[in-house]
Amino acid sequence: MISGVVFITAGEPYTRDACAAARSVRDSNPALQIDLFCDAAAAVPDGIFDRIHVIDTPHRRSKVDCLPLSRFDRTLYLDSDIRVVADLSSMFALLERFDFAAAHAHARNRSQTNARWRHDIPDAFPQLNGGVLLYRKCDKVQELLRDWAQSFSDAGFAKDQVTLRELVWLSDVRLFVLPPEYNVRYPKYLKVWDEDEAKAKILHFKTFNSAEDTNRRKRPLKSLFGLFKG
């Protein structure tokens, strides 16, 4: 069983961001293999990724096309705006009992987060955040991922999580919902959690994307990130 991390990017700015994210994986999980699917391989320095796979027909959600192509038996997909700050081996152990794992979407009261595709789904089954996805290679998951790619193309939503929610709801994959420390979406959470509540494992902040105009927020973020660097 080979476990590994996959990044998928379209566009050179996001590819550069993925390089920074991958370095954080290397620092905290040196034994993990890391692959990149991208359309800007020339922007990638040597020594960061184990393998680079070129995307021939990139688009803003190339992720959904490439997830089924992972060579790993157990895959952790990460967005490019992520920093890994702890050992992740226990995540892969989840796949001994479950097929697919993700955290709930955080902004669950937004209209786009509650968007309906084809079927009404209970509010108590919210969207899953697509930036941290853990899955095992099996027929059920491969079918789910291929259906997700097709549905994103057909449905016309700007966000890919709308169709994922319904597909998972209708699927018989064994789903595990990751606790929030495995997908910390906002720096403010780090200010209110005490040491007995949770220890962040994966930081998933928009401010880690250089492609975003977020310079005004990066100084306080650096201070928070420094908590994990010793």
Predicted regions mapped to residue ranges:
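Glycosyltransferase catalytic domains, chiefly GT-A lineage
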Residues: 1-230
